[in-house]
Regions:
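Extracytoplasmic gate region of multi-pass secondary transporters
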Residues: 42-44, 222-280
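Structural signature of the two symmetry-related core transmembrane helices
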Residues: 91-105, 297-312
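Helix-loop-helix hairpin linking two adjacent transmembrane segments in secondary transporters
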Residues: 145, 153-198
């Protein structure tokens, strides 16, 4: 189309950089922030749903875990079918954002205790395969000796987007529907804006999926250790992201005392946004340092600190900030 740009048109002839690189990177990051608000849109309002509709604990847990399960299924399906190479990245992102926005928005027309919501959360998670991994492919097309920084920017955008529903909940008052609806609207905006993104000159196709890759991921020791470390990190991180809001709500409810339910809810939402959102700075600075200090060293230090925090926070229940 008229918005396409060939590789020769985006290479800076001076060799100093890639013309149009940073506007495109920031546009992509913005789209990720807007679209990834869908991930925890329903999780952010679990305390309100439990209070107003007696939502069972097991069903509340599925609000978050269904998204993760959908993401795994969606990512594997995309990899096996090679969707990221068969479908132009911008179009893939747009379609995924639109479908996820619709699935998320349909929550508003269902009873909060309906099991159909779990399926909609699963579908939302599956669509994330067209947003986050595809976004990584898009940002890599602009990498030139600064892969760590670019990946850090994108992970930071993911983090900020994941934190945003907790901020929506605060600005929307006590109505949980506001956070759900706003997340869908922002995802649609992301799907429209992504069409203005121009891929960099290093864009390339991924090799076709082969089942042997699964075995290689285990038999190659460095890759196996990296995957196991990432698995443990994700187990901790997404458990924290999913439940820190519920934990803080219960903690502040106890510490503030009876009759302070609204204050506890707003305070929990604000602190949860800050707790998750501060990861944006961690991702940015981590990306900068990774290219200088080494990814393995930085990752080990970050995971050690994160693990210590995870152990310590349980002993602080019922305390204030």
């Amino acid at each position: 189309g008229g918005g396409e740009m060939n590789n020769s048109a985006v290479v800076d002839p001076s060799g100093a950089g890639l013309a149009g690189k940073w506007p495109n990177i920031f546009l992509l990051a913005l789209c990720e922030v807007l679209a990834l608000s869908l991930w925890f849109s329903a999780t952010a309002v679990i305390p309100e749903l439990k209070s107003a509709y007696d939502l069972p604990d097991w069903q509340a847990s599925l609000f978050s875990s269904a998204v993760a399960m959908g993401f795994v299924v969606g990512t594997m399906t995309s990899a096996i079918l090679g969707l990221a190479d068969r479908i132009p990245s911008k179009r893939f992102f747009m379609i995924a954002a639109f479908i996820a926005a619709i699935a998320n928005g349909l929550i508003l027309v269902l009873p909060p205790t309906s099991m159909l919501i779990i399926f909609l959360r699963f579908l939302t998670g599956a669509c994330m395969a067209g947003l986050y991994p595809v976004g990584m492919k898009m940002v890599a097309s602009w990498a030139r000796g600064d892969t760590g920084l670019l990946v850090g920017l994108l992970v930071g955008a993911l983090t900020l987007g994941s934190a945003s529903p907790h901020l929506f909940k605060i600005t929307g008052g006590v109505d949980w529907r506001f956070a759900i609806g706003l997340a869908s609207v922002l995802a649609i905006v992301a799907g429209l804006l992504i069409n203005f993104f121009q891929p960099g000159p290093l864009e390339k196709k991924s090799p076709p999926f082969r089942p042997a890759y699964l075995l290689h991921a285990w038999t190659d020791k460095p890759l196996r250790l990296a995957n196991l470390g990432y698995f443990g990190h994700m187990w901790e991180l997404y458990a924290m992201w999913a439940w820190i809001g519920v934990f803080l709500h219960a903690s502040f409810t106890q510490s503030l005392g009876a009759g302070q339910g609204d204050a506890a809810s707003h305070l929990a939402g604000l602190v949860t946004f800050l707790v998750v959102g501060v990861g944006t700075l961690g991702a940015l600075f981590g990306g900068l340092l990774a290219d200088r200090l080494g990814r393995t060293t930085l990752t080990m230090a970050a995971m050690a600190i994160s693990g210590i925090c995870a152990i310590a926070i349980g002993f602080l229940f019922g305390g204030n900030i």
